[in-house]
UniProtKB/Swiss-Prot annotation:
The chain crosses the membrane at residues 17-39, 59-81. InterPro entries: PSI_Ycf4_assembly. Pfam families: Ycf4 (PF02392). Belongs to the Ycf4 family. This is Photosystem I assembly protein Ycf4. GO terms for biological process: photosynthesis. Keywords: Chloroplast, Membrane, Photosynthesis, Plastid, Thylakoid, Transmembrane, Transmembrane helix. Its main location: plastid. Seems to be required for the assembly of the photosystem I complex. It is found in: Plastid, Chloroplast thylakoid membrane. Coiled coil: none annotated. Signal peptide: none annotated. One of its GO terms (cellular component) is photosystem I. It comes from Cyanidium caldarium (Red alga).
Amino acid sequence: MKKIKRDKIVGAGKISNYLLLIIMLGGGISFFIVGFLSYFKAFEHIALFSRFVNSDIRFIPQGITMIFYGTMAICLSIYIYFSIYYDIGAGYNEFNLISKKVVVFRKGFPGKNRLIKFVLPIPHLKSVKVMARGGINPKYEVFLYTKNLSRIPIGQVFKLSKLEYQASEIATFLGLAFEQYNL
């Protein structure tokens, strides 16, 4: 039987984040340019914009609003870019029966607390719990509960069936109780 189990956690470098970055940056730049050009009434002179943009866009209030939304989208895309670059949230969960410790390691933004590492003794753990909230925006999470009722998130977001399997596998490996809680 294996004595060490290590689960890799994927961070912000997912394909969905790359797509979100491209769409948000493209839309933000487009909004910013249209809003900026509305100040100069330059739509009549630029063939590219005259086909796609109504030349009746006034700088106040439409142009200013488009510049604002474009700037916000560009700022959010910069945030997403740095999240991908620094691979925020990536790490691993290591369950070691030899040393009787669980290590939860994650990466964060640069600074004093860039690397987050929890080391928990297995005897202090109480259970592995899956929390599921259904509805329009479902949320599934796996937690390690300690005996003093602190909870440490250890799971990634999967489909519920895969998440339950992962949690039950961890509970069996560590010899802990497995609980499920539906909201």
